């Protein structure tokens, strides 16, 4: 079943894949990494002016990594704002996804956390560096194939 936003994207010949709806009825779309930035700009212009959250996950050991964006279209006089979930999948060998920091400033720390925990590299992010782990930490702790070190030293926060 195709949702309203998916139908609009098809009408304007924008490449995507509909993944259906979640349990709350929110449409979920898959966008290719190379198309993500231009579609994000279009979604912002279309009225999706609020990035509610961005997160990432490891789909399977040795498999794809996903960056997930929950966007909301907030308008005055509307009781129920429209929401959409966008998923961008990348292989472990090329984890580059365009940053949407310049569209939605709230992506700043969220993209940094996804980088820190899963190693997804957000291109053109102004401060893409570790946010939770020390800079010297080796590896990406939330990847399913991550092997935790036998010993690590707890350091004071900076």
From Swiss-Prot:
UniProt xrefs under Gene3D superfamilies: NADH:ubiquinone oxidoreductase, 30kDa subunit (3.30.460.80)
One GO term (biological process): photosynthesis, light reaction
InterPro entries referenced in this protein's UniProt entry, alphabetically: NADH_DH_suC, NADH_quin_OxRdtase_su_C/D-like, NADH_UbQ_OxRdtase_30kDa_su, NADH_UbQ_OxRdtase_CS
Gene Ontology CC terms, in alphabetical order: chloroplast thylakoid membrane
EC code(s) of this entry: 7.1.1.-
SUPFAM superfamilies: Nqo5-like
Pfam families referenced in this protein's UniProt entry, alphabetically: Complex1_30kDa (PF00329)
GO molecular function annotations of the record: NADH dehydrogenase (ubiquinone) activity; quinone binding
Catalytic reaction annotation: a plastoquinone + NADH + (n+1) H(+)(in) = a plastoquinol + NAD(+) + n H(+)(out); a plastoquinone + NADPH + (n+1) H(+)(in) = a plastoquinol + NADP(+) + n H(+)(out)
Chief location of this protein within or outside the cell: plastid
Assigned keywords, A-Z: Chloroplast, Membrane, NAD, NADP, Plastid, Plastoquinone, Quinone, Thylakoid, Translocase, Transport
Subcellular location: Plastid, Chloroplast thylakoid membrane
Family, similarity comment: Belongs to the complex I 30 kDa subunit family.
Quaternary state and interactors: NDH is composed of at least 16 different subunits, 5 of which are encoded in the nucleus.
Entry function: NDH shuttles electrons from NAD(P)H:plastoquinone, via FMN and iron-sulfur (Fe-S) centers, to quinones in the photosynthetic chain and possibly in a chloroplast respiratory chain. The immediate electron acceptor for the enzyme in this species is believed to be plastoquinone. Couples the redox reaction to proton translocation, and thus conserves the redox energy in a proton gradient.
PANTHER family per UniProt: NADH DEHYDROGENASE [UBIQUINONE] IRON-SULFUR PROTEIN 3, MITOCHONDRIAL, NADH DEHYDROGENASE UBIQUINONE IRON-SULFUR PROTEIN 3
Name of the molecule in the record: NAD(P)H-quinone oxidoreductase subunit J, chloroplastic
Gene expressing this chain: ndhJ
């Amino acid at each position: 079943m195709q949702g309203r936003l998916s139908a609009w994207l098809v009408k304007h010949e924008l490449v995507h894949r509909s993944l259906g709806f979640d349990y709350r009825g929110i449409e979920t779309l898959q966008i290719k990494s190379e198309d993500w930035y231009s579609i994000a700009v279009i979604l912002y212009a279309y009225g999706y002016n609020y990035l509610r959250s961005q997160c990432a996950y490891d789909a399977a050991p040795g498999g794809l990594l996903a960056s997930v964006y929950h966007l909301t279209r907030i308008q005055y006089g509307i009781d129920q704002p429209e929401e959409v979930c966008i998923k961008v999948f990348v292989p472990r060998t090329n984890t580059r996804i365009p940053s949407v920091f310049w569209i939605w400033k709230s992506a700043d720390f969220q993209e940094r956390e996804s980088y820190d925990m899963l190693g997804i590299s957000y291109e053109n992010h102004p401060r893409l560096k570790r946010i939770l782990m020390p800079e010297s930490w080796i590896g990406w702790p939330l990847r399913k194939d991550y092997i935790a070190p036998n010993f690590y030293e707890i350091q004071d926060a900076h």
